Amino acid sequence: MEKVIRRALISVYHKEGLAEILAELNRQGVEFVSTGGTHEFITSLGYACRAVDDLTRYPSMLGGRVKTLHPMIFGGILARRGHESDVREVGEYGLPLIDLVIVDLYPFEATVASGASEEDIIEKIDIGGISLIRGAAKNFEDVVIISSRAQYAGFYSLLKEQGARTSLAERRHYAREAFAVSSAYDSAIFRYFDDGEQTAFRMSSDSPKVLRYGENPHQRGFFFGNFDRYFDKLQGKEISYNNLQDIEAAVSLISEFSAPTFAILK
């Protein structure tokens, strides 16, 4: 079923690429609701934007740890438009329905990679943003969720082509992407806290390395993980699945030696 976007909640860490979407949403008459730095960014572009604390009647608190975690926000996201009791409670509690959520999470992995202190790393564990992603994705029948800057260009094209309207298939697609983002984010946090104990294996990636082909040339292949972190390809074609098998054999071979060693496989 087609849905019209009338109100958007926007809370992003990085602002790059957002201006074009805001311009198109504003042209379509969409109302903006936002928090902190994102609110300042939106108003600096000359657009009217309602602050989240105007809706919640609570200020941002605990050093910004609590901003959007409130029934006035999540009620407006999770309310099922075709559910009689939900509609009744929306009216009873004056919940502002939210049709679009745009989130860009705190850069947890980048903070870890920068060598930051644990205090700084912990503060980059996003709570409100990840909750907004999950809430909006759960209610994809009524709500659009844009959960990554990587989705901005595609969503902007959609807005230009069909206005502030989305199909159920489009909303379901973005929900799928949202759960991919949230699972990758939580996997990164788990790996940090696992501290090398390897009590479990968690791997999630929204950008796997595309291989030249799978085990056979007619098959597709993907590598999930950070290949470039451990290996430098000096020359030749793109890596295939069989190349990875050779690399694994070479690594297993040289790991038997404590002195610097190299292996040649053909």
Language model: regions and residue ranges:
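N-terminal glycine-/serine-/threonine-rich phosphate-binding loop
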Residues: M1-L55
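Short coil/turn connectors at secondary-structure junctions
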Residues: V4-R7, R27-V30, L45-A48, H70-F74, ...
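Short beta-strand segments
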Residues: S11, L78, V101-Y106, I146-S147, ...
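Short acidic, glycine/serine/threonine-rich loops at helix termini
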Residues: E20-L22, T43-Y47, S60-G64, E89, ...
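Glycine-rich nucleotide/cofactor/substrate-binding loop typically near the N-terminus or early
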Residues: G37-P107, A200
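A short, charged helix-loop
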Residues: L100-E123, I127-A169, R220, G225-F231
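Active-site loops and adjacent core secondary-structure elements that bind or stabilize anionic groups
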Residues: A150-L158, G163-K266
